[in-house]
């Protein structure tokens, strides 16, 4: 079963980040045999790194063995709905930290897969994570 790749890991590779680039690239290579996918949210978040050129972005993803056409399904919406409601409830009671809704969408999407490859494991508590 495939792994979902978080935006930060792909940006590490794209930007050849001095701190995280090599580890992120090696992590992707190590999980390639299981399959690598991104959520529609990550597809959108990557756009600025390619100046909005979808063709260049898709070439980068293809070179790195990452599928980008996996659809968002209603079950993802239902999971996201629950995750976001829980997040807001915790925040209102002072038990949660500020969290972008994009992370909730990525986590909801990742629940259908083996887990999430991310540098931010604390942001994704309901799915298995691999940190490069």
Per-region residue spans from a language model:
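Phosphate- and divalent-cation-binding pockets in alpha/beta enzyme and binding domains
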Residues: 45-46, 79, 126
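Acidic, PIN/NYN-like endoribonuclease modules and their adjacent C-terminal/linker elements
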Residues: 2, 107-132
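Short, structured coil segments at secondary-structure junctions
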Residues: 62-64, 127
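Histidine- and aromatic-rich ligand-binding microenvironments
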Residues: 5-6, 39, 99-100, 120
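Short, well-structured N-terminal submotif of metal-dependent ribonuclease cores
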Residues: 1-38, 48-62
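Short, hinge-like loop/turn segments at secondary-structure boundaries
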Residues: 54-57, 87-88, 132
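Alpha-helix capping/helix-boundary segments
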Residues: 9, 42, 76, 105-106, ...
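Active-site neighborhoods of divalent-metal-dependent phosphate/nucleic-acid chemistry enzymes
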Residues: 68-119
